[in-house]
């Protein structure tokens, strides 16, 4: 897909790895969706997704509620988009409030569904836990989650030869909880 004469990969039902998306020439754009909590809202959102499909975004990302509060809803929306549209869904996956085995289980479910990419994030604690103790999470930071996804890929657990494409996000101005930007880079 990279190296084609299109500004971004053609959106098809064939796998599109996030690296291919960002290695293409020209502009790229995406849409981000938050999974609704009711069936009626889900159908309304999916109708909108089908209408936006004709815009041919490079990918669509699906958020993951604070502390994984929308874990199942996110998974269901990602799989529905994957199976019924030509769009490339990229689910957010956060490490807050998750054990290592939970993360492994989530990755396995996405791999088995044919999902090619993950957006690895630290995430926010649930609203009712503003003082959440991150030391109790299996991965305190997204960098550790990225390592776990790479280990998952290296174990050959994903059916695709490349495994998951991994996207990350950052704070250009520095993470609010980091008192020293130089230390943050380490």
Model-based region annotation:
Residues 2, 7, 72, 111-113:
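An N-terminal assembly and electron-transfer interface module characteristic of large anaerobic redox
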Residues 10-19, 42-51, 55, 68-87:
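Glycine-rich, positively charged N-terminal anion/phosphate-binding segment
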Residues 30-35, 60-65, 90-94:
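Short glycine-rich or small-residue beta-strand-to-loop segments that form or flank ligand, phosphate
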Residues 24-28, 37-60, 84, 100, ...:
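Alpha/beta enzyme core
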Residues 66, 96, 124-125:
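Conserved beta-strand edge residues that scaffold enzyme active sites
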Residues 2-5, 10-11, 53, 67, ...:
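Positively charged, amphipathic and often flexible ligand-engagement surfaces
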Residues 71-107, 116:
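Metabolite-binding pocket within alpha/beta catalytic cores that recognizes anionic/polar moieties
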Residues 2-42:
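An N-cap/entry alpha-helix motif that binds or orients negatively charged groups
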